[in-house]
Swiss-Prot record:
Topology term for the membrane: Multi-pass membrane protein
Keyword Nuclease set for record: no
Glycosylation sites: N44, N144
GO cellular component terms attached to this protein's record: lysosomal membrane; plasma membrane
Gene: hrg-5
Chain ranges passing through the membrane: 21-41, 47-67, 89-109, 123-142
Induction annotation: Constitutively expressed. Not regulated by heme level.
Keywords: Glycoprotein, Membrane, Transmembrane, Transmembrane helix, Transport
GO BP term, pick one: heme transport
Similarity remark: Belongs to the HRG family.
Superkingdom to which the source organism belongs: Eukaryota
Protein name (record): Heme transporter hrg-5
A GO molecular-function descriptor: heme binding
């Protein structure tokens, strides 16, 4: 019985919007520090590019979480959610393809994972998975809110 209570509290903690906001802010800060380290120290331009993209997508995620917390996301248009969903799904699949291609090229050309300086496609591929995570998370959030908008819209039409 107590394990069910503790697991539900744990889920409540990690699913709470404040926790998601804090983790997203932490990811944005990690992204900025990695952008600087890839540019200044390691000169890994492909990983730098994808890190910058992840940071931008994380900023968009933060915007959605803050709108959810302030309950202003309910004022967004249905079409906005559809655009967010389809753009993020497309970007997620492109990033997933980038991940696969980077890992195949890194494996075939025998790039060492431990070699941090210069181009290292292992790191580029890892950042592509982060893009996939954030874009699909945004797409699911947009889909949930678009479904709620559609249900509310149909209830308003039925009442009229």
């Amino acid at each position: 019985m107590s394990s069910k209570i503790s697991s539900s509290r744990c889920c409540t903690l990690f699913c709470h919007v404040n926790t998601r906001i804090a983790l997203t802010i932490l990811d944005i800060l990690i992204g900025f520090s990695n952008i600087l380290s890839y540019a200044i120290q390691f000169h890994n331009w492909s990983a730098l590019t994808l890190t910058a993209m992840v940071t931008l997508v994380a900023c968009h995620t933060l915007q959605m979480f803050l709108a959810e917390k302030k309950n202003t996301i309910t004022h967004w248009k249905y079409s906005t959610f559809k655009w967010i969903m389809w753009i993020d799904i497309t970007l997620g699949f492109l990033a997933l393809g980038c991940f696969v291609v980077c890992f195949i090229i890194a494996g075939v050309t025998e790039i060492e994972f431990t070699n941090l300086y210069g181009e290292n496609l292992w790191f580029t591929g890892l950042w592509a998975t982060a893009i996939t995570k954030y874009t699909w998370q945004n797409a699911l959030l947009a889909r949930n809110y678009s479904n709620q908008k559609r249900i509310l819209k149909s209830e308003i039409v039925e009442d009229a």
